[in-house]
Amino acid sequence: MTALPAASITSSAFDDLDALNAQLEGLHADQRVAWALQHGPQNAALSSSFGAQSAVTLHLLSQQRPDIPVILIDTGYLFPETYRFADALTERLKLNLKVYRPLVSRAWMEARHGRLWEQGMVGIDQYNNLRKVEPMRRALDELEVGTWFTGLRRSQSGGRAQTPIVQKRGERYKISPIADWTDRDVWQYLQAHDLPYHPLWEQGYVSIGDFHTTRRWEPGMREEDTRFFGLKRECGIHEDI
């Protein structure tokens, strides 16, 4: 696809999101980032789970705005490999990492509620709200984020299949610059820039969250089946905020 000149899309394009998304579909991912940084609301930030393919958006954003805040929600239940991966990428890309944690510790939450992730959909939803949604909402509010970049891709799950490049959530704009990328696009970008997958990728983990609700991919499974015992794909961050 021949990319349109980003300069031809002005700030007033936010007034018609359908038309804006149609125009942004014609841009390359780096052009989408540049356009959103120039024309989007003040205080841009990128959220990252430091998951399987997170190095793409971390590199894409940090190349254009090195000091952009990178929000990581530390649930307290991440894989040890995820913490080490976050350390390695933070050092390599000189990331401005902002770590947010739940208001209640692991031990206190389990004392109050037990192992919520083993209590069906109701328990999983409560767990996600306590350990993911609330800290992310707090991070976005405290950092006064007006333009929120994510690494969402349409091919990741059925629920993300219609992800637009830009959407409005309250007074905030949410930008997904690689929404239309395939797994091959991701691989090519990582190869081109000598960037790593998450260490657990080689062990069969294709979507990586908390250790107790993430499993290896096996033949016949969809990517979303590897999370939350196959009951759901989303943790609530990209549904409720």
Swiss-Prot record:
Pathway: Sulfur metabolism; hydrogen sulfide biosynthesis; sulfite from sulfate: step 3/3. The keyword Oxidoreductase applies. Its EC number is 1.8.4.8. It is found in: Cytoplasm. GO terms for biological process: hydrogen sulfide biosynthetic process; sulfate assimilation, phosphoadenylyl sulfate reduction by phosphoadenylyl-sulfate reductase (thioredoxin). The active site is at 235 (nucleophile). Catalyzes the formation of sulfite from phosphoadenosine 5'-phosphosulfate (PAPS) using thioredoxin as an electron donor. This is Phosphoadenosine 5'-phosphosulfate reductase.
